[in-house]
Amino acid sequence: MASGKATGKTDAPAPVIKLGGPKPPKVGSSGSVSWFQAIKAKKLNSPQPKFEGSGVPDNENLKTSQQHGYWRRQARFKSSRGGRKPVPDAWYFYYTGTGPAADLQWGDSQAGIVWVAAKGADVKSKSNQGTRDPDKFDQYPLRFSDGGPDGNFRWDFIPLNRGRSGRSTAVSSAASSRAPSREGSRGRRSGAEDDLIARAAKIIQDQQKKGSRITKAKAEEMAHRRYCKRTVPPGYKVEQVFGPRTKGKEGNFGDDKMNEEGIKDGRVTAMLNLVPSSHACLFASKLTPKLQPDGLHLKFEFTTVVPRDDPQFDNYVSICDQCVDGVGTRPKDDEPRPKSRASSRPATRGNSPAPRQQRLKKEKKPKKQDDEVDKALTSDEERNNAQLEFDDEPKVINWGDSALGENEL
């Protein structure tokens, strides 16, 4: 989207949303979809969303009186062999007087519509904010400074400065989290924007108290970042991230079981309770810097004291006995069982090593569909689905009770 310097006064409409791209979108856009990314129901047939705050996405370019609109339900489907399969609904935000329900007054009752307004908004007025042209602009990430939707809904947290190459960076794309190699915009963020991101991230973290989820791309990044900042992602062996276990030198913690299971081993979670935080390591350690041919080596010496009256004292002692210089060993209760000896009885029909003859399974014929149109999506549904980001659940790894401190990610 080319940008140019203004030469005097102009009758062109003012920009609506300050999004950090070369030129923000203008009022009266010819698009037909929401400016914002969707919130998505976690289950089929979820009730309509309720919000902790006003329910209006943050937009610093609008006056308080203009902060009102509606959330509209969007039914979603996936193509499958047997036809089309419904998936949980998505809900999109539109300002009053725009979008599919542009002819409604604020508060008019209609199925699949939830009206929202900020305190002090003039709901009798209609907005001239227009809608988005998806061929020109990406979706704008959702931010709720006063509280987001209830726990029946989710949305993906996207940094405001993340954009897509080859298209306008006026709006950060929800799809960018599926491609971490895409370059983010290099514009500076204001302190207020950083604070807003922190608040939004906290809201999402609060909604996901039952357990965080990490994508495969994020896990790969965790395992290959700078060595001193690495963490062991789910499904990884310790040696994949920090190298083979040793004895008597650095890397001497972990027996064979811990190395194989990584953070699944409960002993990891236990011992991480004793590991110093970054600040403790920096300010409470004995730090010894040493210049070497390959660079500056920093040695941190820190002592954690576990009182003898600690309820877990014996467990910590046991874990240290097992895992310090533990390479080549396993816990006693995890020793592999010896294989049972082969039977010396003569082979009979019952115990013969020859495989039994299997019955041939009948091939299932695909069911005929009375309505062939039902097998494919309609053109409207194809267009709607094309607008949706993160339709499918991303390939994620259940993190469970995190073995990492909140400052480690």
From Swiss-Prot:
Pfam families: CoV_nucleocap. One of its GO terms (molecular function) is RNA binding. Its main location: virion. Residues 31-156 form the CoV N NTD domain. Residues 29-160 are annotated as: RNA-binding. Residues 1-31, 46-83, 121-149, 164-193, 327-409 are annotated as: Disordered. Keywords: ADP-ribosylation, Disulfide bond, Host Golgi apparatus, Phosphoprotein, Ribonucleoprotein, RNA-binding, Transcription, Transcription regulation, Viral nucleoprotein, Virion. One of its GO terms (cellular component) is host cell Golgi apparatus. It is found in: Virion; Host endoplasmic reticulum-Golgi intermediate compartment; Host Golgi apparatus. Residues 226-333 are annotated as: Dimerization. Residues 341-355 have a biased composition (Polar residues). Residues 215-331 form the CoV N CTD domain. The modification Phosphoserine is found at residues 190, 379. The modification Phosphothreonine is found at residue 378. Residues 70-83, 358-367 have a biased composition (Basic residues). ADP-ribosylated. The ADP-ribosylation is retained in the virion during infection. CDD domains: CoV_N-CTD (cd21595), CoV_N-NTD (cd21554). Residues 15-31, 164-179 have a biased composition (Low complexity). Residues 180-192, 368-384 have a biased composition (Basic and acidic residues). Disulfide bonds join 320-323. Homooligomer. Both monomeric and oligomeric forms interact with RNA. Interacts with protein M. Interacts with NSP3; this interaction serves to tether the genome to the newly translated replicase-transcriptase complex at a very early stage of infection. Belongs to the gammacoronavirus nucleocapsid protein family. HAMAP family: GAMMA_CORONA_NCAP. Packages the positive strand viral genome RNA into a helical ribonucleocapsid (RNP) and plays a fundamental role during virion assembly through its interactions with the viral genome and membrane protein M. Plays an important role in enhancing the efficiency of subgenomic viral RNA transcription as well as viral replication. This is Nucleoprotein. The lineage of its organism: Viruses, Riboviria, Orthornavirae, Pisuviricota, Pisoniviricetes.
